[in-house]
From Swiss-Prot:
This protein is involved in the repair of mismatches in DNA. It is possible that it carries out the mismatch recognition step. This protein has a weak ATPase activity. It comes from the Bacteria. Residues 1-22 are annotated as: Disordered. ATP binds at G632, P633, N634, M635, G636, G637, K638, S639. Keywords: ATP-binding, DNA damage, DNA repair, DNA-binding, Nucleotide-binding. InterPro entries: DNA_mismatch_repair_MutS (IPR005748), DNA_mismatch_repair_MutS-lik_N (IPR007695), DNA_mismatch_repair_MutS/MSH (IPR017261), DNA_mismatch_repair_MutS_C (IPR000432), DNA_mismatch_repair_MutS_clamp (IPR007861), DNA_mismatch_repair_MutS_core (IPR007696), DNA_mismatch_repair_MutS_N (IPR016151), DNA_mismatch_repair_MutS_sf (IPR036187). The keyword Secreted does not apply. This is DNA mismatch repair protein MutS. GO terms for cellular component: cytosol. Residues 1-17 have a biased composition (Polar residues). It comes from Azoarcus sp. (strain BH72).
Length: 872
């Protein structure tokens, strides 16, 4: 199917200026015909050294790229709006447009000037969309660019996604309410959905959304397309037959990707059905709150990824990002990864990890280079980088052999054993320092092809021939300053000054007359010129043919290269885990079949790097201790403590060591967080509504094997409403969900739950008052806190002193007031006089410091005047 059909699903499009194409100039007719096939994309139309855009495309590009909008004459009686970018800088403009979610069609000149009447022939050479990028210049080397197709049927969300840069093809079916969580996990660059699907949330989540015809999302079409592609009778071997909604999405995705690449997708060698149950459940709020790869402000650091990513290759960085967003529920693979990390750490000297990281240094992006080879758009320097990377593999395998051949390390070493003939082929074929593009020549190595060597020899010997000819002609003509030279405009020529023009032999034919010299050509020089120029053109054509043949020869190695790339990425990620363990003192966690979490000396991996003295804390949860009711002052460290427990569990389930003295972890199926909130203006939801929505998801989804983090639930509404909700939610978690819960609150009434539910333990993060200052200890202690120190924190924040004094007075009054039956009291009602309330007035403080028996009459008088001034 053509991309034009994919894009024209709603209605027939008119030409950009709303007139019949035939009324335009021939060149504009050619442009409009191409544009008609791609109405929803920007068209870059090659004209000489520029890519031009016209009409509405020009206006849009000028606005998005901040380039000049001008006019270029008229067509059909109307001015042609035009904007353009130089061809040599096109990649940077494409990158900017793709980041903005735009797609671009590039039409190149394919004809020869003057070969036909009318404009030079042009044809579409590339279609660039956010989800189908393969060029290194357009891709973020540390983040995957995924193309995702989604469909909905009877409450089932079917998804298919493709990483075109490396050929990974995945499917999943899940409940429709999982949409946001899945999008937060996958972060697709471009999304395809049926034209008839009404899904407002998708409009918000998708960075680049494209609607396709409903009939393209058909499971039967998927069977036909995919069995043809994989060369199988059915799809049973891939285990995807049970997911018809996802298969329909896969059909639309495959057709779209193939149309954009304009060729077969040879590197799509498999199809895998993922299931939600494979991974720890992390909803969108949890991924944000734990700041795995982005801070709450949307910045790349400081995050867990920015801390751990010391990878030597871009493949390793992408593997690490993926691993953090895909903690595995089955602990077999995480345990195997931890065994490999332990092998790299060794006895604590880190020599194995250092050796592996040293061998990986300088390894290119084999993953994406392999994809470009399969798509036949690999550039010469891709192949030279692949050659250099493959040459490092023997050293890397030798290092792994010294570590051991058991477990995951042995499997990775085996995957690195790529056939030696592949490296030999690249060493023979590609020049040591090839040109950037095949069209520039100098790509194929000398000695690889006899015909190419002969043609290059003609060019190489050109200088010797010209020097010999110049010497002979000087002797024959007697003109001592005669020169034989070359330029691109006039080719080869013999140059003679006007003063010697009468001495030239009869066989000289004038080629050009200049102010001071005459330029000639002879039959011998003309014959050599034809041969030399022909050799250059033939050499370039031969080199292009050899390069295409080389890509063909590399195709059978694509599966092996894909396996090698996966092994390199995994090894790099595991080495980064080992580096973190060595650098920060992480330990190997222990997985247990008994429910619970037992952490000694736990730390927050990111926060501990931001502060000078981080206080370690223990955490113990189990069947008889399912909830920790955490109280304590603001800034005391409650949120940090809860997050560190969650991050330690997550790191264990991705296969890393953890920041603790020890950690024993029982089975987990999910991590839920309700930490902080802000208004969701786009959806019209208040802070409290966001808070309740997240709490609802937890109460409906958490199980006895889930870790739940609840931070100050109920604070977004009135005091009694919030307290009532917090109490009811805590009881539900204890009675119904029976989750392992960390429940932080300032409602001290909740600490009474311990009397009704022994499995709810009270703990607090303490603080002490030192003079007029408050010191946060950040240490977790048993029992409830004595107070929240909220007013003291307000003073630290710079709230004016009169406000602080007024707040203290009102707090004392509220604490002394009996809360009776009836409606909720008004916090802002006038306070009754309270003569017994001790006020911290400066006069009272000064009086308390006076010892009357020790004062002389003069000192007493001075103190009296001082008190008078204080009371003024």
């Amino acid at each position: 199917m053509s991309i034009s059909k994919i894009e024209s699903v709603n209605a027939e499009k008119q030409s950009p200026v709303g007139t019949e194409i035939g009324t335009h100039t021939p060149m504009m007719q050619q442009y409009l015909r191409i544009k008609e096939q791609h109405p929803d994309t920007l068209l870059f139309y090659r004209m000489g050294d520029f890519y031009e855009l016209f009409f509405e495309d020009a206006e849009k590009a000028a606005r998005l790229l901040d380039i000049t909008l001008t006019t270029r004459g008229q067509s059909a009686g109307m001015p042609i709006r035009m904007a353009g970018v130089p061809f040599h800088a096109v990649e940077q403009y494409l990158a900017r447009l793709v980041k903005l979610g735009e797609s671009v069609v590039i039409a190149e000149q394919v004809g020869e000037p003057g070969a036909t009447k009318g404009p030079m022939e042009r044809a579409v050479s590339r279609i660039v969309t956010p989800g189908t990028l393969t060029d290194a210049a357009l891709l973020d080397d540390r983040r995957d660019a995924l193309l995702l197709a989604a469909n909905m049927h009877r409450g089932v969300l079917g998804m298919a996604w493709l990483n075109l840069a490396n050929g990974e093809f995945r499917l999943m079916e899940c409940p429709a309410e999982s949409l946001q969580a899945q999008f937060e996990r996958l972060r697709p660059a471009e999304v395809l959905i049926p034209d008839g699907l009404a899904l407002p949330l998708m409009e918000t989540l998708a960075p680049a959304l494209r609607r396709l015809a409903d009939w393209q999302f058909d499971a039967d079409t998927a069977h036909r397309l995919l069995t043809t592609h994989f060369g199988t009778r059915d799809l049973a071997g891939f285990g995807v037959e049970e997911a018809p909604v996802a298969l329909g999405a896969a059909a639309a995705l495959y057709d779209y990707a193939k149309a954009t690449q304009r060729q077969s997708l040879a590197h799509l060698t498999g199809l895998r059905l993922e299931r939600e149950a494979e991974f720890l459940r992390l909803d969108a709020a949890t991924r944000r709150n734990l700041e795995l790869t982005e801070t709450l402000r949307g910045e790349p650091s400081p995050t867990l990824l920015s801390l751990l990513d010391t990878c030597m290759t871009s493949m390793g960085s992408r593997w690490l990002r993926h691993a953090l967003h895909h903690p595995l529920r089955d602990r077999t693979i995480p345990a195997a990864r931890q065994q490999a990390v332990a092998a790299l750490v060794g006895d604590g000297d880190g020599l194995h990890a250092q050796a592996v990281r040293g061998a990986l240094r300088g390894v290119a992006d084999v993953d994406r280079i392999t994809g470009r080879i399969a798509l036949r758009n690999a550039r010469p320097r891709d192949l030279s980088a692949l050659r250099e990377s493959l040459s490092r593999l023997p050293e890397l395998r030798q290092t792994l052999a010294q570590i051991g051949d058991e477990g995951m390390v042995g499997g990775l070493a085996a995957a690195l054993d790529v056939q030696p003939e592949l490296l030999q082929c690249l060493q023979r074929a590609i020049a040591d320092e090839p040109a950037a593009m095949v069209r520039d020549g100098g790509v194929i190595a000398a000695g690889y092809d006899a015909e190419l060597d002969e043609l290059r020899g003609i060019q190489t010997n050109c200088g010797e021939f010209l020097m010999a000819l110049e010497a002979r002609e000087r002797e024959r003509s007697g003109i001592a300053n005669l020169k034989v030279e070359f330029n691109k405009v006039h080719g080869f020529y013999i140059e003679v000054s006007h003063a010697n023009a009468d001495k030239v032999p009869d066989d000289y034919r004038r080629r050009q007359t200049l102010k001071n010299v005459e330029r000639y050509i002879t039959p011998e020089l003309k014959a050599f010129e034809d041969k030399a120029l022909s050799a250059q053109e033939r050499a370039l054509a031969r080199e292009k043919a050899l390069y295409e043949a080389l890509l063909d020869a590399l195709s059978p190695y694509i599966p092996a290269l894909q396996g090698c790339a996966r092994a390199l990425a995994t090894l790099d990620g595991l080495a980064a885990f080992a580096e973190a363990a060595l650098r920060y003192g992480y330990v190997r966690p222990v997985f247990s079949d008994q429910p619970g979490i037992e952490i000694r000396g736990g730390r927050h991996p990111v926060v501990e790097r931001q502060v000078e003295d981080f206080i370690q804390n223990d955490a113990r949860l189990g069947s008889t201790r399912r909830m920790l009711m955490i109280t304590g002052p603001n800034m005391g460290g409650k949120s940090t403590f809860m997050r560190q427990v969650a991050l330690i569990c997550l790191l264990a389930h991705v296969g890393s060591f953890v920041p603790a003295q020890s950690a024993v972890l029982g089975p987990l199926d999910a991590i839920f967080t309700r930490i902080g909130a802000s208004d969701d203006l786009a959806s019209g939801r208040s802070t409290f509504m966001v808070e309740m929505t997240e709490a609802s998801a937890i109460l409906h989804g958490a199980t006895e094997h889930s870790l739940v983090l609840m931070d100050e639930i109920g604070r977004g509404t009135s005091t009694f409403d919030g307290l009532a909700l917090a109490f009811a939610i805590a009881r539900h978690l204890l009675e119904k969900n029976r989750s392992l819960t960390l429940f932080a609150t300032h409602y001290f009434e909740l600490t009474r739950l311990n009397g009704e539910y022994p499995e709810c333990a009270n703990v607090h993060l303490d603080a002490v008052e030192h003079g007029h200052r408050i010191v946060f200890l950040h240490a977790l202690e048993d029992g409830p806190a004595s107070q929240s120190y909220g007013i003291e924190v307000a003073a630290l924040a710079g709230i004016p002193a009169p406000v602080i004094r007024d707040a203290k007075r009102r707090l004392r009054a509220l604490e002394n007031r009996e809360v009776g039956a009836g409606p909720q009291a008004d916090l802002f009602a006038a306070l009754p006089d309270d003569d017994d309330a001790p006020l911290s007035h400066p006069v009272l403080i000064a009086l308390a410091e006076i010892d009357p028996d020790s004062l002389s009459p003069r000192e007493a008088l001075e103190r009296l005047y001082a008190l008078k001034r204080l009371s003024a």
